[in-house]
């Protein structure tokens, strides 16, 4: 008899919960009209940023494409007249991108940055393949004063290895053997 009474009590408790929720106002947000507040660290669409001088930051080092778990980033490196590398073309397939942010972490020049913009819905899947021209923005992104090309990426003819500022002399590996 005790177990029957507990079953009736549990059933009545469930009905009471349902009865209370029956008179509450439904919480429905109409998405396109009412945007949800996103967290500060939201990662979504990738952009390519520029230097404070206005030049492209990407040096086509292929680190972003190597670290990408879904292989959605592809590019081709080229060299400018002054000896600096740049991406001749840069392509991201957002149909495959999982917005993990590994490409942003791997980028040594802070060229790739993830923005909180996430509304990239398209009916044609080919429109989700973004080229370099679609990804380049006219600002520095999160790192306003960072200028990778100020020192790096420029060939210098000032002495040999180990003779530059803040550079150690080369180590002879054979002399370090035990």
From Swiss-Prot:
Main location: membrane
Gene Ontology cellular-component terms listed: plasma membrane
Enzyme Commission code: 7.1.1.-
Binding site for [4Fe-4S] cluster 1: 58, 61, 64, 107
Subcellular localization, as worded in the UniProt entry: Cell inner membrane
Protein topology in the membrane: Peripheral membrane protein
Keyword Iron-sulfur: yes
UniProt catalytic activity: a quinone + NADH + 5 H(+)(in) = a quinol + NAD(+) + 4 H(+)(out)
One family name in Pfam for this protein: Fer4_7
GO molecular function, one term: 4 iron, 4 sulfur cluster binding
Annotated keywords: 4Fe-4S, Cell inner membrane, Cell membrane, Iron, Iron-sulfur, Membrane, Metal-binding, NAD, Quinone, Repeat, Translocase, Ubiquinone
Cofactor(s) in the UniProt record: [4Fe-4S] cluster
InterPro entries per the UniProt record, alphabetical: 4Fe4S_Fe-S-bd (IPR017896), 4Fe4S_Fe_S_CS (IPR017900), NADH_quinone_OxRdtase_chainI (IPR010226)
Cofactor annotation remark: Binds 2 [4Fe-4S] clusters per subunit.
Residues that coordinate or bind [4Fe-4S] cluster 2: 68, 97, 100, 103
Similarity section: Belongs to the complex I 23 kDa subunit family.
Protein purpose: NDH-1 shuttles electrons from NADH, via FMN and iron-sulfur (Fe-S) centers, to quinones in the respiratory chain. The immediate electron acceptor for the enzyme in this species is believed to be ubiquinone. Couples the redox reaction to proton translocation (for every two electrons transferred, four hydrogen ions are translocated across the cytoplasmic membrane), and thus conserves the redox energy in a proton gradient.
HAMAP family from the UniProt entry: NDH1_NuoI (MF_01351)
Protein name per UniProt: NADH-quinone oxidoreductase subunit I 2
Protein source organism: Syntrophobacter fumaroxidans (strain DSM 10017 / MPOB)
């Amino acid at each position: 008899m005790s177990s029957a009474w507990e079953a009736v009590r549990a059933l009545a408790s469930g009905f009471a919960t349902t009865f209370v929720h029956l008179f509450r106002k439904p919480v429905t947000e109409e998405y396109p009209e009412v945007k949800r507040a996103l967290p500060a660290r939201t990662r979504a669409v990738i952009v390519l940023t520029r230097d404070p001088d206005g030049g492209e930051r990407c040096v086509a080092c292929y680190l972003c494409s190597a670290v990408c778990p879904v292989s959605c980033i592809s590019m081709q490196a080229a060299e400018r007249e002054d000896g600096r590398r740049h991406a001749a073309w840069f392509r991201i397939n957002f149909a495959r991108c999982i917005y993990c942010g590994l490409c942003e972490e791997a980028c040594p020049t802070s060229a790739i940055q993830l923005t909180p913009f996430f509304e990239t819905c398209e009916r044609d899947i080919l429109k989700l393949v973004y080229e370099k021209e679609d990804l380049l923005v006219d600002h520095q992104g999160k790192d306003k004063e960072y200028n990778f090309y100020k020192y790096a990426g420029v060939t210098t003819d000032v002495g040999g290895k180990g003779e530059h500022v803040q550079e150690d002399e080369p180590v002879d590996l054979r002399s370090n053997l035990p």
